[in-house]
């Protein structure tokens, strides 16, 4: 009797292990997870990988657009953030440039071009921080 339950238990453990394919324990893994979410069209989840400051800035812009439209615009901040975004190019390399406390910078090589991305560590892990680029 006990032996027949073992395969079901193993199957359940394998299924649970596959649920968490995204990682946020390092700046590189957080960026990789964010990139994968965007590529898969998982924009609501990808929005959750943005830092709290970035989400606040996007929400403020979304509210300003709603106010200007007289309340006719019904889009959520995450929808506005990713609206008209092209499919991201494949990333060929992600390198940690620096990590100082809860702030890190990674160098992302994509389509032969490199750019630096800032990340911050929050309670749930590393997050993409674009708040400086969203300032008016």
Language model features by range: what are they?
Residues 1-5:
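Positively charged n-region of N-terminal signal peptides that target proteins for export
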Residues 7-15:
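Bacterial N-terminal signal peptides
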Residues 10-11, 34, 95, 105:
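Exposed boundary/loop context
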Residues 13, 24-25, 98:
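Generic signal for short, ordered secondary-structure residues
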Residues 19-23:
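Bacterial signal peptide processing site
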Residues 28-32, 36-98:
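Short solvent-exposed beta->alpha transition segments
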Residues 83-136:
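Exposed beta-sheet edge and beta->alpha loop/turn motif
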């Amino acid at each position: 009797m006990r032996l027949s339950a073992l395969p079901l238990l193993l199957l359940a453990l394998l299924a649970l292990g596959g649920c968490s394919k995204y990682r946020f324990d390092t700046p590189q893994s957080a960026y990789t997870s964010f990139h994968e979410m965007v590529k898969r069209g998982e924009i609501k989840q990808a929005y959750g990988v943005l830092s709290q400051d970035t989400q606040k800035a996007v929400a403020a812009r979304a509210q300003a657009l709603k106010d200007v439209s007289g309340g006719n615009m019904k889009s959520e901040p995450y929808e506005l953030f990713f609206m008209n975004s092209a499919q991201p190019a494949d990333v060929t390399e992600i390198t940690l440039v620096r990590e100082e406390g809860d702030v890190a910078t990674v160098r992302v090589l994509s389509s032969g071009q490199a750019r630096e991305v800032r990340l911050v560590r929050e309670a749930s892990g590393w997050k993409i921080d674009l708040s400086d680029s969203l300032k008016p």
